[in-house]
Amino acid sequence: MKILCVSDQIDPLIYNSNAVKNFPDIDLILCAGDLPMDYVDFIVSVFNKPTYFIFGNHDLKEYKYYHNVPGTNSSPAATSQTNSHFVSNNINKTDQHNHHHGAIYAGFKNLRLKLVSFSKNNKKKTPLLLTGVSGSIKYNNGLCQFTENEMKFKLVKLIPGLLLNKLR
């Protein structure tokens, strides 16, 4: 399985008309934070591959659509997504708000990707498990910044979903 991972800045090798020629055989794309959502949208449109993203601590204009943020008009999807420990990608169309840009938000969720699988030595197809963690260490009380204890608590909440997957 070949995964294209992008983060932090717009890459001219990707953000051009030859992007598919530069990366012809990728299976999956991970957008690992601090990217403008228009760039994520471009990546989804050009590559037409399963794309997953998290937020970093910058470019947070659309963060409110995926999380409950006091003082904003958060989407109903934010409430249901933040309370779940395990999300199967076959229900994401009903979960996502209109601002998804074609990519699936993986922040603080375990995603069992039935459409993206890999084969082990025994040739059995196994769904890929992807767990996303958004944000950074708290340094100015901005959005998507967490203390060490806050992050530990968020990570511990992901454990039941990971254990459930292990039992399958």
Regions found by a protein language model. Give the residues of each.
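Short, acidic/turn-prone active-site loops that include or flank metal/cofactor-
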Residues: 34-35, 54-61
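Short secondary-structure transition/capping segments
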Residues: 43, 64-66
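Hydrophobic/aromatic beta-strand patches that form the interior of the parallel beta-sheet core
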Residues: 30, 52-54, 106, 131
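N-terminal active-site segment of His-dependent metallophosphoesterases
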Residues: 1-46, 164
